[in-house]
């Protein structure tokens, strides 16, 4: 396919137009008085959102050169979202500011490679400054503040803080769509997996259609059970000791299933059978997790165990097991705390090493099931459009809160970036020539978020920036919601350090790429040839 090429200033200006198209659309959403953007959907209702990355992903430009700039800026938003889960609008805005300032200097004859090194040096200083002013987050109130700021909703903030309080920082918190108008929190204690009873005849509560076993023993095996002879020695021990039995197996069918059901109906013993969770190697790992949590052993021929030789002390134990048609929940597993901790650390190490997002998500789920539990936030709203928007906000707030727990918090409202100007200024003073000019580009960009938050609130950004700088108080800032100057920490206006840091680093990375670009190559658009008119005698469809 033929290509079009643009060089030098012409290429960079085309990229800048693409950058501006994305940034100008995204930046109107910044701050508590930021506006929404309506996204057209081919099918169904339009999406109304103020989430930077969602908006950026929707933008495709007609001009192929400008579109390259737009795609590069999308990369800033997407990468920031992947790493920190929030701060995509800030990242987009910072990148736009750096590109704008950088291109001015290039037009005046600056060396792009020296500018790039200057930008990198200044960003390193700013990141160190952010670490210096960051405060650890350790109480429910601080978590609620972070979540409330991100979601722009106090109720959601409190729900997220409560969810984190219940399941711990390693716990899994998921967001689902509710059928009701309100937004609620549901917490599942213990380990839950998405497999229900194999036969409905195994329920202990016919009204609720669920089986609840108090103090049961748990057989964990990767075998398919169809022959009752394999199970008889174990069942005799279970009946002798008057225990209730939960069987977690690859499958239970045929004669084995029929015998278990008949004995349950006769009242000989209480038994519930469920299929093992997961698939393939993940299934083996999850069975091992359940075994460690309940203090049992996985009965597997690979490990040299035969079902006929199973003793009662090889089975897992728990305070309670609840089995519904779709889920099994094990509460109060009798596993050794040290062994569970060892397993948790092993999974954490795997999370660090994996490069697959899917694997990471599955490992996080396993970690949560071992470490604490699962919380589900049910998002409710009056219309489908509002529901989508609310779910987006909750997911963003959740990601921001996790980032805050990880690396701490800094004053919000763009103030943290103003606070590190002194750190960057020291670097600027130590440099000269185009190296210095590159560092100055970052210096100017650091003011941009405060200016934009103020502009979205309808006030002059430059005046606000100068007032904050003159105050010399690191926590002094502008509350755009109440339209007043205040102590940001006391007012609960905080941002996660990780979000601010990631936004700045990713913005600088893409800006440097654009500034050092000397040519852009794109495909020549194909000409759509119009279909010929149907000839005489042809039927019109």
From Swiss-Prot:
Which keywords are on file for this protein? ATP-binding, Chaperone, Cytoplasm, Isomerase, Nucleotide-binding
Q: List the disulfide bonds.
A: none
Q: Which Pfam families match?
A: Cpn60_TCP1
Looking up PROSITE patterns in the UniProt record yields: CHAPERONINS_CPN60 (PS00296)
EC no. given is 5.6.1.7
Q: Where in the cell is it found?
A: Cytoplasm
According to its UniProt entry, the protein's GO biological process terms are: protein refolding
Enzyme class name: isomerase
- Family assignment? Belongs to the chaperonin (HSP60) family.
* Complex formation: Forms a cylinder of 14 subunits composed of two heptameric rings stacked back-to-back. Interacts with the co-chaperonin GroES.
The record ties this protein, via NCBIfam families, to: GroEL, PRK00013.1, PRK12849.1, PRK12850.1, PRK12851.1
Q: What does this protein's UniProt record list under function?
A: Together with its co-chaperonin GroES, plays an essential role in assisting protein folding. The GroEL-GroES system forms a nano-cage that allows encapsulation of the non-native substrate proteins and provides a physical environment optimized to promote and accelerate protein folding.
Q: What is this protein called?
A: Chaperonin GroEL
Organism (species): Thermoanaerobacter pseudethanolicus (strain ATCC 33223 / 39E)
